[in-house]
Amino acid sequence: MPAIHGLNKTTLLDYPGRVAATIFLGSCNFRCPFCQNSSLVLHPADEPVIPEEEVLSFLKKRRGILDGVCISGGEPTLASDLEDFICEIHALGYPVKLDTNGTRPDVLKHLAERGLIQKAAVDIKACPDNYPSLTGMMHPDLTAIQETVSFLLHGNLDYEFRTTVVKELHNENDFIQIGQWLKGAKAYYLQAYRDSDEVLQPGFSSYSLEELEHFRKILLTTIPLVEIRGID
């Protein structure tokens, strides 16, 4: 079963419209400088592991209080036995939302076609041209990410796209290009960056609400629902 490195026992944010628990798995194939979970990305083997039985027991006891489970990371589609783990969660009656960077479309498609995930949230790091600098990878697999985007745009799985917006890394042109790339998407969220010691490269800053609202208006020309998250 996948190594579980974190459990947020109650969240109203991670699975919109549901009272959910979020499970964090380790490892990632990106090295985004603004990543909020650097320890899970860089040194997952050094992080404490929560036994699967403990997590499933918690979920069993919380039935009737929780009504959803979010699986995040890291990049959860890299985890071994992810499918079996989700089957265990489904057996308890929970719908599952999967957070992903979109680099493993075959895993996403398989889980969706088996009815094992009810929603996907895909992190759009930047416009395609800027993926190398914002993912820390010289040659990120943009073909795979495009396959994920196309699958969601033209499929039946509920989804959202989202971008953590960093002042030093994103600008107006990014969102003009992203708006064209994701044209017709059902939902897109601009997430305000928050600096912390857990960030892979701390020291970045966030745009103001007014600046994020400007990006939102750009995106609304091609995407019908665009909202801002993370502003107090």
Q: Where are these predicted regions, by residue range?
A:
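Short, charged low-complexity linear segments at domain edges
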Residues: 1-18
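SEC14/CRAL-TRIO lipid-binding/transfer domains and related phosphoinositide-recognition modules
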Residues: 3-8, 27, 41, 53-54
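Conserved beta-strand termini and adjacent loop/short-helix elements that scaffold enzyme active sites
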Residues: 7, 191-193, 228-231
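Canonical Radical SAM [4Fe-4S] cluster-binding loop centered on the CxxxCxxC motif
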Residues: 15-50
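A secondary-structure boundary/capping signal
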Residues: 24, 72-74
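Conserved alpha-helical substructure of the radical SAM core
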Residues: 38-69
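Conserved AdoMet/S-adenosylmethionine-binding subsite of the radical SAM
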Residues: 56-68, 77-209
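A C-terminal junction/extension of Radical SAM enzymes
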Residues: 213-232
